[in-house]
């Protein structure tokens, strides 16, 4: 594959423009540094060891990840300073966590209940170490996280246990990330994270600990949250490659570039209204937002649309006024990058549209 033009690749496939990727990573890092914030980017988006390493090389303080199986792959690849952002409860996941901590004992984990805290303290005792914990705060999603009413007492208990070490709090508002209007998004996120910051201050005063972490934020609120004094680090993920959902919201600073695109080929053109392509729901995660077609056969176009009418697992429908011929390659920005990436095995990395590397999506399918 190395040396081929991207239009020669078999489809459907994911292509990453390396220069745009690096630009996005460096842009985020410089922005955060100017605001005196750390970046602990979330690898749930790209699921790729090579991209993690680029982020660390650019100055990220560590890597955020959701599942123990994902974290274990990163630890084996010598990616350090991990934050696992979802509670680890089952015996199988706790066994995986034990393996992670043996490779990377500085790893941090979130906790949101007394019951889970007891499990983690017991694991720390068995491993003869103190496990680094952030108290996870429910940001209003109702998904994970302790309530603001219970988080203070939970933090004190973490601090009192012999085999756990309180490092701070996490408050991630995923439901704010795609609020279209910047002002509405800013108002919501600022109110929430200031409330979390007051909680952090109360915990510091009660425990005598200083400089506790306040982690959270995403691609939709990174610029807003970086102006909040109590926030110490941000966890954006999609900024690396971007997607249509994030291009649709209002930012007050410059946009990141569409570093990742999906290529699909026209396989049937027997109708005047549409053509059929080889990317269905097995290649492209279905959202209410449609993909944005940006080119056919390398030529810019704005008159084609990928429609979500039911064309099946293997096929997609492209309509428009200037329909492409059989064999044409369609390039598009995907609606939602995280789950789309999880459908693929590899990234084809290009410079000037020529493949220069093939990177495994090593965390793909690591759901446990």
Go through each PLM region and give its residues.
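Active-site-proximal beta-alpha core segment in soluble small-molecule metabolic enzymes
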Residues: 42-177
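C-terminal accessory subdomain/extension
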Residues: 270-368
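Conserved, mostly hydrophobic/aromatic
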Residues: 21, 44, 74, 135, ...
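Active-site loop ensemble at the mouth of alpha/beta enzyme cores that anchors a bound cofactor
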Residues: 187, 222-299
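N-terminal glycine-rich anion-binding loops that anchor highly charged ligand groups
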Residues: 20-51, 66
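Active-site loop/helix belt of alpha/beta enzymes
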Residues: 138-251
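Flexible, glycine/charged-enriched surface loops at secondary-structure junctions
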Residues: 37-38, 205-213, 326, 344
């Amino acid at each position: 594959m190395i040396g081929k033009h991207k239009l020669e690749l078999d489809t459907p496939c994911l292509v990453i423009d390396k220069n745009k990727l690096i630009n996005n990573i460096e842009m985020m890092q410089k922005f955060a540094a100017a605001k005196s914030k750390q970046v602990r980017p979330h690898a749930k988006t790209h699921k790729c060891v090579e991209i993690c390493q680029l982020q660390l090389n650019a100055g990220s303080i560590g890597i955020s990840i959701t599942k123990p199986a994902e974290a274990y792959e990163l630890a084996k690849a010598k990616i350090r300073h991990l934050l696992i952002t979802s509670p680890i409860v089952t015996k199988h996941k706790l066994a995986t966590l034990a393996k992670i901590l043996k490779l990377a004992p500085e790893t941090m984990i979130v906790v949101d209940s007394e019951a889970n805290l007891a499990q983690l303290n017991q694991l720390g005792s068995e491993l003869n170490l103190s496990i680094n914990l952030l108290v996870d705060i429910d940001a209003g999603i109702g998904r994970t996280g302790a309530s603001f009413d219970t988080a203070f007492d939970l933090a004190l208990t973490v601090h009192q246990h012999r085999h756990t070490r309180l490092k701070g709090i996490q408050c991630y508002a995923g439901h704010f990330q795609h609020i279209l209007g910047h002002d509405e998004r800013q108002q919501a996120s600022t109110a929430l994270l200031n409330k979390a910051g007051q909680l952090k201050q109360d915990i510091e005063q009660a425990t005598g600990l200083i400089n506790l972490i306040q982690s959270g934020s995403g691609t939709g609120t990174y610029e807003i949250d970086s102006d909040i004094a109590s926030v110490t680090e941000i966890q954006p993920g999609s900024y690396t490659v971007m997607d249509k959902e994030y291009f649709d919201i209002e930012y007050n600073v410059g946009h990141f570039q569409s570093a990742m695109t999906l290529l699909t080929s026209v396989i049937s053109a027997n109708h005047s209204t549409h053509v059929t392509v080889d990317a269905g729901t097995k290649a492209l995660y279905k959202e209410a937002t449609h993909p944005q077609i940006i080119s056919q056969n390398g030529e810019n176009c704005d008159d084609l649309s990928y429609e979500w009418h039911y064309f099946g697992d293997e096929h997609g429908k492209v309509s428009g006024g200037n329909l492409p011929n059989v064999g044409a390659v369609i390039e598009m920005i995907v609606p939602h990058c995280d789950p789309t990436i999880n459908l693929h095995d590899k990234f084809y990395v290009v410079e000037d549209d020529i493949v220069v590397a093939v990177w495994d999506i090593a965390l793909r399918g690591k759901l446990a």
